[in-house]
Amino acid sequence: MPTSNGLRVLVAEDNPINQRVAVAMLRALGHQGVVVSDGEKALRALSQLPFDVVLMDVTMPNCDGMAALAELQERKRQGVRIPPVIMVTAHDLPGDREHFLGAGADGYVAKPMNVAALTAELRRVLGQ
């Protein structure tokens, strides 16, 4: 459900610099980024507000991206609507994409993110 300003994107990222970069990229693409700093806050935000897509860092304090993804998959099995989740990580070794997709992620973008890769993955996971 895109807003009049594009997509509403939850950015789950603990690094302040990466938060600013992600929000700036989203803004440049005409989207709105809402930032949380860990997986627990991402799960809470997803319970309270509608989002079109989630950019989820893998390594975060309190509740990492993989634990949050597992909880989202459980919610999905219970019939809760979960937006597509794109894992954003510095883990960019052979097999990493398959690992994250196999765990239930809808997409994957390696850090450092660039606008072209983010745009392509947003389009792919949203079927555009």
Region annotations inferred by a language model:
Residues 113-122:
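C-terminal output helix
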Residues 38-41, 64-71:
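Acidic catalytic/metal-coordinating carboxylates
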